[in-house]
């Protein structure tokens, strides 16, 4: 049995070292692992994800956070404004990051491509439902029904309601430049 140094159990909150009393096998208590003087924990990682700090989450995990989804039909607005997106129905019980626009890598059809993804309600178009979609750079294949994996690399910006479609398109152009130039 392996337990963290701060694991507790039972109504009287027994600690990990007490497990040896109740468990007949070997008990290994893992010491704390620190990052910048703070304990790395699932709570800390979840907080980073839920606040959109996907780069920090990746540093704590040791690998990029990822989410899988099945490509479904959306409203096709992205295509009409020059930024086609793969609209995703999440299939894992993973945490999506906070609403925003992100630099991502997208694994599709066995290859990885740089892109940008958004999580949010598309308020510029008065959206009310949460959307999870990715613009995959230099990619134009029909992938409806395929499962793709999004690797969250860094947050570009918060979701914003733009005054016009033109203002949105101008911002998406800037987002694309940032995403294409992003380095680890």
For the regions a language model picked out, list residue spans one by one.
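Phosphate/ribose-recognition catalytic cores of enzymes acting on nucleotide-derived substrates
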Residues: 74-184
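Classical nucleotidyltransferase
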Residues: 2-84, 107, 163-167
